[in-house]
Swiss-Prot record:
HAMAP family: TIM_B. Pathway: Carbohydrate degradation; glycolysis; D-glyceraldehyde 3-phosphate from glycerone phosphate: step 1/1; Carbohydrate biosynthesis; gluconeogenesis. The modification N6-succinyllysine is found at K149, K156, K194. The keyword Glycoprotein does not apply. It comes from Sus scrofa. It catalyses: dihydroxyacetone phosphate = methylglyoxal + phosphate; D-glyceraldehyde 3-phosphate = dihydroxyacetone phosphate. This is Triosephosphate isomerase. NCBIfam families: tim. GO terms for molecular function: methylglyoxal synthase activity; protein homodimerization activity; triose-phosphate isomerase activity. The modification N6-methyllysine is found at K194.
C-alpha cells in the first residue's frame, strides 16, 4: 500500500504586517500545539523572510511569495532562488492568481520559474485555478489542466512540488468552494497526473486547496480524500491559523 500523503498547510501573508504584529503572530504559532504529521510553511513578505526564519520555530518552514526565472542580473525589483535560500527559506510560491492576473505573468513564465526554482533546490508550491467566468462557462477542467501541464513540463523531481488548487473566485472573497467542489477538482487533477506522470508520483503528489479557508470551513474540507492540505491567506494572519493547521 502506498504511503499516506503528509498534510500540508501553507500560510500566505501577502503584502501584510510589520515586525511588531508579525512577531506576535509568530509567538502564537511557536506556542501552539501543532501536529507532528502536518507540514507547515509560512510565506511572509520578502522584506521579512529573514525575520520570520529567525523567529519561527525550526519545525515551521519559510517560503518566499515569488522568485524570478534566473539567478542574477539586471532585473530591478526581482529576487532569485539562491537569494531566497540565503535568507533561510526553503520554499517558494509560484503561479498565484495575483501574479497571473494583477502582474500579468503567463503560464510560460511561471513554468520557467518553476524549473529554475527546483534546479536551485527550493521546494515549489505551484498554484492553479479558474476565474468565476471560466467556472460558469464550464471550462474549469480545461483551465486547470492547461496550467498544470505547463508546470508538469518543467518538473523533473516531484518530491519538492506541492500543487495548490485555488479557484480565483474564492480568494479573498469570503466565498469558499464546497468540500464537494474542491474534492471534484482535486480528484480530476490527480486523474490528470496519472495519465501524464508515473502513477506513483500522481499518488504521492500533494494537492492542497486555497480560497477563503477559515477555522470554520477547514475540517470538512480536510476530510476529503484528495484534499491534502491548505493554502491560507487572510486567516493565516490570525490565531485561527492554528485551528486550520490542526484541521486533519
Amino acid at each position: 500500500m502506498a504511503p499516506a500523503r503528509k498534510f500540508f498547510v501553507g500560510g500566505n501573508w501577502k503584502m501584510n504586517g510589520r515586525k511588531n504584529n508579525l512577531g506576535e503572530l509568530i509567538n502564537t504559532l511557536n506556542a501552539a500545539k501543532l501536529p507532528a504529521d502536518t507540514e507547515v510553511v509560512c510565506a511572509p513578505p520578502t522584506a521579512y523572510i529573514d525575520f520570520a526564519r529567525q523567529k519561527l520555530d525550526p519545525k515551521i518552514a519559510v517560503a518566499a511569495q515569488n522568485c524570478y526565472k534566473v539567478a542574477n542580473g539586471a532585473f530591478t525589483g526581482e529576487i532569485g532562488p539562491g537569494m531566497i535560500k540565503d535568507l533561510g527559506a526553503t520554499w517558494v510560491v509560484l503561479g498565484h492568481s495575483e501574479r497571473r492576473h494583477v502582474f500579468g505573468e503567463s503560464d510560460e513564465l511561471i513554468g520557467q520559474k518553476v524549473a529554475h526554482a527546483l534546479a536551485e533546490g527550493l521546494g515549489v508550491i505551484a498554484c492553479i485555478g479558474e476565474k468565476l467566468d471560466e467556472r460558469e462557462a464550464g471550462i474549469t477542467e480545461k483551465v486547470v489542466f492547461e496550467q498544470t501541464k505547463v508546470i508538469a513540463d518543467n518538473v523533473k523531481d516531484w518530491n519538492k512540488v506541492v500543487l495548490a488548487y485555488e479557484p480565483v473566485w474564492a480568494i479573498g472573497t469570503g466565498k469558499t468552494a464546497t468540500p464537494q467542489q474542491a474534492q471534484e477538482v482535486h480528484e480530476k487533477l490527480r486523474g490528470w497526473l496519472k495519465t501524464h506522470v508515473p502513477e506513483a508520483v500522481a499518488h504521492s503528489t500533494r494537492i492542497i486547496y486555497g480560497g477563503s479557508v477559515t477555522g470554520a470551513t477547514c475540517k470538512e474540507l480536510a476530510s476529503q480524500p484528495d484534499v491534502d492540505g491548505f493554502r491560507v491567506s487572510g486567516a493565516s494572519l490570525k490565531p485561527e491559523f492554528v485551528d486550520i493547521i490542526n484541521a486533519k
